[in-house]
Amino acid sequence: MPGMPQKVIYPLMEQQYADEEKDLLEDEPLDSKTYDMENLKNKICELLDREKLYLNPEIRVSDIADRLFTNKNYVAQAIKSRMGKNFCQLIHYYRIKEAIRVYALNPDIQMNELAHRVGFNSMTTFNGAFSRNTGYTPAEWCKEYRRKNMDDYDS
């Protein structure tokens, strides 16, 4: 049975993530006294920094919730209320941060390999996330990075 083309699958997956986030955030507001959202936000960031769960292209809100022994509603609410992002935006932020780190260590890496290495399954999604998080396309950013490093080298 032939699979669906990536151009079809990945936008559908992103829509599924967005729909899941919307469903989670439409639940009754949680009482902030019962769970410290700022503390949870810090735990989410620590977990992502330490274990790099964002490298998994199939990561879900529930994966983080399970690791923190809480429920996905709390996680989604902490991300939205304390970081001003939805889950997908947060994961993309971490992936782009990692892409920049990897590129700095290996500036000869191909963009499709870099995108895959940091958890993106689609170049379209990678390019869009990169632009939203840096203000540059990946090609523009790489060109500027090389120029800056050459200027530093010449100094």
Predicted regions, residues:
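Short, polar N-cap/turn motifs at the start of nucleic acid-interacting alpha helices
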Residues: 112, 121-123
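Membrane-proximal linker segments that couple transmembrane helices to downstream signaling/catalytic modules
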Residues: 3-116, 129-132, 139-155
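Residue-level detector of short coil/turn "hinge" positions at structural boundaries
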Residues: 122, 137-138
